[in-house]
Amino acid sequence: MPRRDRNMDSAPCMWMRGGTSKGGYFLRADLPADTAARDAFLLAVMGSPDPRQIDGMGGADPLTSKVAVVSKSERPGIDVDYLFLQVFVDQAIVTDAQNCGNILAGVGPFAIERGLVAASGDETRVAIFMENTGQVAVATVRTPGGSVTYAGDAAIDGVPGTHAPIPTEFRDTAGSSCGALLPSGNAVDVVNGLPVTLIDNGMPCVVMKAADVGITGYEDRDSLDANAELKAKIEAIRLAVGELMNLGDVTEKSVPKMMLVAPPRDGGAVCVRSFIPHRAHATIGVLGAVSVATACLIPGSPAAEVAVVPEGARKTLSIEHPTGEMSCVLEVDDAGNVVSAALLRTARKLMDGVVFV
């Protein structure tokens, strides 16, 4: 385990729910500059490695063991830089190998609350550079009277109640981690005897039919997590595709995500059960949803074979998941390439103070 600086035993922090995840939001200046010291500090903050994370702030779940590191940007046209860090629950690992579109939902409000971005009218647009992949997202935050409000009438599945909407636009996300939308160059690859699509439109994913790995694709999260045979099968595929996806050895990485697709049951475009990567997701990650939605548009792919895709250049695809759905709006050009994606998220400030280790 990395050793942390014993002189650093606390830091200012805001704990927020972002989308269907939650975690700690820090200003970059409030964390150790040295990466190893920073990671050791964050492991202590979360209480990792420990399956219960009992001595830290983590919630014994990858979805609640996340960190956003935010700073004012010096890039033209960008307001803030955002680094996402996934803190493993039961291993002493902190990784920046992926983005998180759910935690991203809290970055705009946090930046305004911390004075990195000035509120401008009833709505404030915040341009966010995602350091993990070098891409840009623009979040629109409600700021009536010059202050962030978290109250509103927007609902997202997986989160009780309603909150202020935070629409977020993504552009140029294709190949953000893998170098190409289809890093292997193929719409379909056969891995361990199964047809899969290796895709990266903001999140590296392996998309395959649920039926091909012996499930329906409609199981609940607990059933999936209890299925050791299924998890071993998809983990073998995940490890086999690391090099094909230009990700190298993915043994200790949180990508690629594993997406098991089935025909929609509730009027959506496709039904998905996702692994992140070793545990089933309660919903689906934002950028994972973008990648799956994009896969639905690729002729001959496993996703396209089960999906119901609307017509038109602007397509709204409802991605069904274990606790509801997530709608992803894709814009395609004349050649059928996805040029932008937009999703609706919400966020809420849970705590603002000092975290101790």
Curated annotation (Swiss-Prot):
It catalyses: (1E)-4-oxobut-1-ene-1,2,4-tricarboxylate = (3Z)-2-oxo-4-carboxy-3-hexenedioate. Gene3D superfamilies: Diaminopimelate Epimerase, Chain A, domain 1. It comes from the Bacteria. It holds the Pfam family PrpF. InterPro entries: OMA_tautomer-like, PrpF-like. Transmembrane segments: none annotated. One of its GO terms (biological process) is lignin catabolic process. Disulfide bonds: none annotated. Pathway: Secondary metabolite metabolism; lignin degradation. PANTHER family: ACONITATE ISOMERASE-RELATED (PTHR43709), ISOMERASE YBHH-RELATED (PTHR43709:SF3). Belongs to the PrpF family. Contributes to the degradation of lignin at the level of the protocatechuate 4,5-cleavage pathway. Catalyzes the isomerization of the double bond between C4 and C5 in (4E)-oxalomesaconate (OMA) to (3Z)-2-keto-4-carboxy-3-hexenedioate (KCH), where the double bond has migrated between C3 and C4 via a 1,3-allylic isomerization. This is (4E)-oxalomesaconate Delta-isomerase. It comes from Novosphingobium sp. (strain KA1). The lineage of its organism: Bacteria, Pseudomonadati, Pseudomonadota, Alphaproteobacteria, Sphingomonadales. The gene is ligU.
